[in-house]
Amino acid sequence: MQEYCYQIRKLKMLKVAILDDYQNVAQQFVDLKKLSGKYEFKIFSEPFLDEADAIEQLADFEALLIMRERTPITKNLIDNLNDLKFVITSGLRNKSVDLEAAKKRKIIVCGTDINVNPTPELTWALILGLARNFKEEIDNMYQGYWQTTIGVELKGKILGLIGLGRVGTEVAKIGKAFGMQVMAWSENLSLDKCKELDVLPCSKDDLITNSDVLSIHVQGGNRYKDCITLKELDKMKKTAF
């Protein structure tokens, strides 16, 4: 009887697919062995050949753990995964999930809390790399040269931000620490937030024409799809990043 109950429990284990873990990081953050009594995990480290391949390989899974927008969870994919009950994404939002199709199938879609620090840190790594010519200097160093360019001092320069949400706020704080003047624009810019951060609210055109460094921190999608085009780039300072 005990053996029979054990077999029943095994049959009821939730089958979970972890998609697009091509950096092999999933097991660094979660000890999957501790969860093996309740869940049967399979990690997909390689991208699918196409959607038909994804449907074939994911047919038996009840839950998909997806990393960002690497594999689109389309209506066609959802409609063809008959056992699918859950879609869990890293981060709060995922533009690649067809939420309407999931809702019709009564599939639960949810996300995780976010760590706001990595994106501002990477943003500032890129800004500093541009201002101090990291790429060119590193390439020249490998050729035997040393200090071949002169960098740009950031203190006193204007940092322009499109978007002043969680990420934009942290980028602004670091900009102020460098002694930069920070300006911001977005369609739903909070004047109270600007006052709190000592950020100058402005029009989009003023932001484009005055910024020495322009950094964009808004959600993807149609709302800001054509936010920066060749027209805007032509208005920027020739020395701007």
Briefly describe each language-model feature range:
Residues 13, 84, 155-158, 230, ...:
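Phosphate-coordination loops involved in phosphoryl transfer and adenosine-cofactor binding
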Residues 61-138, 142, 151-152:
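Phosphate/diphosphate ligand-binding glycine-rich loop within oxidoreductases
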Residues 137-170, 179:
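Glycine-rich NAD(P)-binding loop of Rossmann-like domains
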Residues 56-60, 72-75, 188-241:
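Rossmann-like adenosine-cofactor binding region
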Residues 29, 48-52, 70-75, 96, ...:
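Structural motif corresponding to alpha-helix initiation and N-cap regions
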Residues 35-36, 77-83, 233-238:
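Short, conserved loop/helix-junction motifs that constitute active-site signature segments
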Residues 6-63, 67-68, 179, 183, ...:
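N-terminal glycine-/charge-rich "phosphate-binding" loop or analogous flexible N-terminal tail
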